[in-house]
């Protein structure tokens, strides 16, 4: 799927999510937490170009939806949403929030959303052919078709889990991104341990697409030790 199509679908889907949250008076309701999440995210964004220079041209956005969900995402093109449940239920520290947001940013930097959407579109939904149809219809049909494409693209982004390979890649890049930004990489370990404790009753939404296990925690611990010198050289003094 062309990057321009993915970016357009992501932007439109993000706009729809913002409008829905705003309609329910759930968007950016806590100024302190909004300021906090933006401060953390902006430190990560400042170092994102190390992994993808084009990220400096992205129209980054950062918002918080008031929700009990323990979750966050970064759509293609840098559209970040953090659910307040992630902060409240886990009592997340700045370093732990950086671990989650850095992980989600890494999915966008490596275009994992595009890969997932493209695979599903080609194999099941024919979205590329559908896009060609959009470009050749009259304006009214085009508007209706575009709305369907936005819904479809957003559904694909949220519904399809990342592969284990994509998760490992986002773990590694996200942790390095956090360390380069001066956040403690060991916070990823404490975060996943908190997630696992939440998992004893009802699994957090984050775990439905980001499965946690002891192997993953061990891998994160090993990565954190390797990245400790990088963190030490970049942490705030």
Region spans (language model):
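A Zn2+-metalloprotease active-site environment signal
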Residues: 1-237
